[in-house]
A protein has these predicted regions:
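Tryptophan-anchored aromatic micro-motifs
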Residues: 26-42
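Contiguous, well-ordered beta-strand patches that form the walls/edges
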Residues: 37-48, 57-127
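C-terminal motif of bacterial Sec signal peptides marking the signal peptidase cleavage site
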Residues: 13-16
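General beta-strand recognition
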Residues: 32, 61-62, 86-88, 133, ...
C-alpha cells in the first residue's frame, strides 16, 4: 500500500509540473552593447565602457544602463516581437525601480540606445550563442552575450 501511495504522489508531482519556455530561442538572455556603427558615415564607437545591457525574456526587452558599472535603478522597457529575422520594439516605458513606470512619447530619450522611433524595427543580421548584430536605418548595433 505504501508503494502505491509513493507512486501516486510521484505521478501527481510529475503531471503537475509544467515546462514553460518563451520561444525566443537564442534571443533570450542578457546582452551587452559592445559597438555601434553609423551606417551613413561608416564610423564606429566602442560602447563596452558605456555599460548598456539589453535583457530579453518572455515578450519584454529591458535596457539597463549604468554609470561606472553601478546600476542606477532605472532603465527602459519595451514589448517586442521577433518575426522572420526582424526584431520590432514597441510600447517603450521608462522603468523606475521604486516608482511607477512612465510611457515614453519622446524619441529623444531612446536615441542614446540606438533606437530612433517609438516603434523600431531591427534586422537581425547575426544571432548565435555569443553575439548579436542588429541594424536599423541609421545604426548597426553589436552585442555580446553577458
Amino acid at each position: 500500500m505504501r508503494k502505491i501511495l509513493y507512486l501516486l504522489a510521484f505521478g501527481l508531482m510529475v503531471v503537475s509540473c509544467e515546462l514553460e519556455t518563451s520561444g525566443n530561442g537564442k534571443l533570450d538572455g542578457y546582452w551587452q552593447m559592445s559597438q555601434v556603427d553609423t551606417l551613413a558615415t561608416g564610423g564606429s564607437t566602442d560602447t563596452r565602457e558605456s555599460f548598456i545591457y539589453w535583457g530579453v525574456q518572455g515578450k519584454l526587452l529591458q535596457i539597463r544602463y549604468s554609470e561606472n558599472d553601478v546600476y542606477l535603478g532605472e532603465g527602459l522597457l519595451f514589448r517586442f516581437e521577433d518575426n522572420d529575422s526582424i526584431l520590432t520594439l514597441s510600447s517603450p516605458f521608462v522603468h523606475h525601480l521604486y516608482e511607477t513606470d512612465e510611457p515614453i512619447d519622446d524619441v529623444e530619450i531612446l536615441k542614446p540606445f540606438g533606437i530612433y522611433r517609438l516603434v523600431e524595427m531591427f534586422a537581425i543580421k547575426e544571432l548565435d550563442d555569443n553575439n548579436m548584430v542588429l541594424t536599423n536605418d541609421v545604426l548597426r548595433l553589436h552585442f555580446r552575450r553577458y
